[in-house]
Amino acid sequence: MMRYPEHADPVITLTAGPVNAYPEVLRGLGRTVLYDYDPAFQLLYEKVVDKAQKAMRLSNKPVILHGEPVLGLEAAAASLISPDDVVLNLASGVYGKGFGYWAKRYSPHLLEIEVPYNEAIDPQAVADMLKAHPEITVVSVCHHDTPSGTINPIDAIGALVSAHGAYLIVDAVSSFGGMKTHPEDCKADIYVTGPNKCLGAPPGLTMMGVSERAWAKMKANPLAPRASMLSIVDWENAWSRDKPFPFTPSVSEINGLDVALDLYLNEGPEAVWARHALTAKAMRAGVTAMGLSVWAASDSIASPTTTAVRTPDGVDEKALRQAARARYGVVFSSGRGETLGKLTRIGHMGPTAQPIYAIAALTALGGAMNAAGRKLAIGKGIEAALAVIDADA
């Protein structure tokens, strides 16, 4: 049965990103495209940076780079890491592992702690590595690795790195805005996120917190990109209406970010985090009651923004997702890299971080499993999810 053919738009997108954008954000994207040196746009840009600073709870101005957050992550490696740095990369998933490849490009001295991709980094292992290698100068970690649906204890890790005197790079692309995390909470020197996950805006921008000592290190690094898309230092003062932009900013994306930040701040960050957490909790309860299992090794490290569901033996994961889309109009994400074919990722970020979407996801997932010959107790899954939701009412 193909009620929703591939060429037709899906009914609901429940992926790990890009995610559905809020309708208000989409309307914001449709605002007039202003000349970037028009005083009205320069004032808007300054206000958007101020809103980002408030949302990120920073004591200094954040940086906005004009490309989706992978640009920001690579820029962080290129700008902060110099050839004499010793980098410790913490890998608990595909994206954490991937940052190590960038780090290796800019310094030959790479150490790594890697754990199975359904587990989290143990702060004690970080402490032991820092003690064994006092020469470590930079540590990198992915907070939420979406291909695993797991989160790392970055506040504890950050405290250890700070005490050691090393610089900390944090990938918070799919965690910021969906749970309590801020650059200064985890003592990050470069903290990379974006609007295209939990803030419910399209991909196209990077938001970055940069510590004062990271600014100093990047400026002193002769190999840090300048006059380049990968440059961070070129954008240091771009927030000020009195300073020129290094190149044309993404005007429409700034319009969208302006609205996304207003929505986040007006709803209240704690309220936003709470609905992400409730949706994820309902999702996990339903998955388990239905007879499936969550990929994360324990509930304590399971993400509140993406639930990774283990694919049962004998089930074709790609066919499963295709069935969910064709039969129910619901789109899920696959795994990536080592987790490809082993799990299905169900995103609940931004506008879809609402408990009712857990019910929709369980229905589509269970129905697709049944179509694959795995008869699941869909009703029990929905009942379990509703019990979680109703208990919070």
From Swiss-Prot:
Changing K197L: Loss of function. Changing E68 to A/G: Low but detectable pyridoxamine--pyruvate transaminase activity. InterPro entries: Aminotrans_V_dom, PyrdxlP-dep_Trfase, PyrdxlP-dep_Trfase_major, PyrdxlP-dep_Trfase_small, SP_NH2Trfase/AEP_transaminase. Changing R336A: Strongly decreased affinity for pyruvate. It is an enzyme of class 2 (transferase). Keywords: Aminotransferase, Chloride, Pyridoxal phosphate, Transferase. It catalyses: pyridoxamine + pyruvate = pyridoxal + L-alanine. Pfam families: Aminotran_5 (PF00266). Belongs to the class-V pyridoxal-phosphate-dependent aminotransferase family. Homotetramer. This is Pyridoxamine--pyruvate transaminase. The lineage of its organism: Bacteria, Pseudomonadati, Pseudomonadota, Alphaproteobacteria, Hyphomicrobiales.
